[in-house]
């Protein structure tokens, strides 16, 4: 029995040193050297001040801004510490109520509801933190945002196109629009206008 204790203790110490110290240290140094922005949270700065992250959505509800996906996090929207979906099933009345409330908010903000509403504007993502919407969801909001900002719909649509990211490597994922980046571009365009 005593002959087993020493190898077990040595193995425990070596594995802790490798997996608890060496590997995290090497990955941290590698991340900072090769991908510094991503390793630090993909933070977005404006005028030297951090205004958000490209990875975590933010609540926008003013008519002059594009709106992102709903957040299912509690106790506040887009709470990274509370990441997770609502887990509401398709037949759950609460999900139907949330969808109806979001459609009403879109209508109250002046969005034309004569066209079908893109699903990502009325449902939460699996994480509850999704910072991106589909180009269709952005296009759906162009008229409302243009009217609220006294810009032409074409000018706003051009900003949407400029802020649309295609598929990764041309095949992975779907085209998407980062809502925070688009709204910051809108603010900059209106300031220059």
Curated annotation (Swiss-Prot):
GO terms for molecular function: ATP binding; P-type potassium transmembrane transporter activity. It comes from the Bacteria. The chain crosses the membrane at residues 7-27. Pfam families: KdpC. It is found in: Cell inner membrane. One of its GO terms (cellular component) is plasma membrane. Keywords: ATP-binding, Cell inner membrane, Cell membrane, Ion transport, Membrane, Nucleotide-binding, Potassium, Potassium transport, Transmembrane, Transmembrane helix, Transport. It is a single-pass membrane protein. Part of the high-affinity ATP-driven potassium transport (or Kdp) system, which catalyzes the hydrolysis of ATP coupled with the electrogenic transport of potassium into the cytoplasm. This subunit acts as a catalytic chaperone that increases the ATP-binding affinity of the ATP-hydrolyzing subunit KdpB by the formation of a transient KdpB/KdpC/ATP ternary complex. The system is composed of three essential subunits: KdpA, KdpB and KdpC. Belongs to the KdpC family. This is Potassium-transporting ATPase KdpC subunit. It comes from Burkholderia cenocepacia (strain HI2424). The lineage of its organism: Bacteria, Pseudomonadati, Pseudomonadota, Betaproteobacteria, Burkholderiales. The gene is kdpC.
């Amino acid at each position: 029995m005593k002959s087993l204790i020493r190898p077990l203790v040595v193995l425990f110490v070596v594995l802790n040193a490798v997996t608890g110290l060496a590997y995290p240290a090497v990955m941290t140094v590698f991340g900072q050297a090769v991908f510094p922005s991503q390793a630090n949270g993909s933070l977005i700065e404006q005028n030297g001040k951090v205004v958000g992250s490209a990875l975590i959505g933010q609540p926008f509800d003013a008519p002059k801004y594009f709106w992102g996906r709903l957040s299912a996090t509690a106790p506040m929207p887009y709470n990274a510490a509370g990441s997770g979906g609502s887990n509401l099933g398709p037949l759950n009345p609460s999900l139907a109520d949330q969808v109806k409330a979001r459609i009403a908010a879109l209508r109250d903000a002046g969005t034309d509801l004569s066209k079908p509403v893109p699903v990502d504007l009325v449902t939460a993502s699996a994480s509850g933190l999704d910072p991106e919407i589909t180009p269709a969801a952005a296009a759906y909001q162009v008229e409302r945002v243009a009217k609220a900002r006294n810009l032409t719909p074409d000018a706003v649509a051009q900003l949407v196109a400029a802020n649309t990211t295609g598929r990764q490597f041309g095949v992975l994922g779907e085209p998407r629009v980062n809502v925070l980046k688009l709204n910051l571009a809108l603010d900059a365009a209106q300031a220059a206008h």
